[in-house]
Amino acid sequence: MYIVETLDNLIHQTAFFNLEFGNYVMIAVALFFLLLAIKFGFEPLLLVPIAFGMLLVNIYPDIMAPYGDGGAGGGLLYYFYKLDEWAILPSLIFMGVGAMTDFGPLIANPKSFLLGAAAQFGIFTAYFGAIAMGFNDKAAAAISIIGGADGPTSIFLAGKLGQTTLLGPIAVAAYSYMALVPIIQPPIMKLFTTEKERKIKMGQLRPVSKLEKILFPIVVTIVVSLILPTTAPLIGMLMLGNLFRESGVVRQLTETASNALMYIVVIILGTSVGATTSAEAFLNTDTLKIVALGLIAFMFGTMAGVLFGKLMCWATKGKVSPLIGSAGVSAVPMAARVSQKVGAEYDPTNFLLMHAMGPNVAGVIGTAVAAGTFMAVFGVF
């Protein structure tokens, strides 16, 4: 009898008896993301950990159990998630991005800042769209950053504004659209440009001196942080990583920030973001609204960048390719690669990558500034 009861207890403790239909739906979504990442190569560094975190939390929800529940110590991914909520991991991601980024194209062509700024139009489109859909001001602000296609900044702002219940859907939407940049952007770019404009070649960028590259992160940190102190965690870490790279005197720190530390943070960030997508938290109308708003915002941001690129093309009498305008969103370097790919489709000798990197890295700064602006407006520091 004791053996039968033991077996019965073991059977009823399996996940099969504790999961609901929604959990199986989310498991299917996680497997789909893994398929996209592994078989089709859609940003595997992002989607594999996110999808696996999604898989784990929907099979074993207690992996996200808060500290103190029933006297327990809390689930493993709960502690990972707190690093998101406290804005530690997004800031470290920015340091790694800075250590890997060459701001030379932006320094050589400062007009790229305008294209990066134009692409932020999608953020404010999403903000007013979210307000219209019934979200409160802070929730709308957190959702709107998806329009910049910037996962770390989306997580950072959602945590700072206290929108922790929306952090999962916001982060998954932001990272999903980052991964889908090669699919979403080209049709918009082609819709708003002529074949002649797509064939425009741009002149070689001027050489950028070592002194300029060293001064850039220092000056940007001082200027932006003085104007918007709330941007200091993101801009400061981004520029610190870049200063590691450009100074040339801390090679070990550059390698650590851009490789080992970056990948460790991506693993922890990805799995913890995925773990916020339990069926209960994710399968609701708010999630559908966030996904829709994110897509619309990203499309509007791409469109605004391309249209501003057309304006610059007209103003410079054909010296600027409108295709680099779409790179103003902060999905680095995916958006710049898309500009290169679309341009090469119409002229294989057209090399736009370095020109597109200017607005692309400007978009990273622009999205961080937009997040800092929202924080300042709502009095969050």
Predicted region positions:
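Alpha-helical transmembrane segments
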Residues: 165-183, 293-301, 324-327
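Transmembrane helical segments that form the transport core of multi-pass membrane transport proteins
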Residues: 221-308
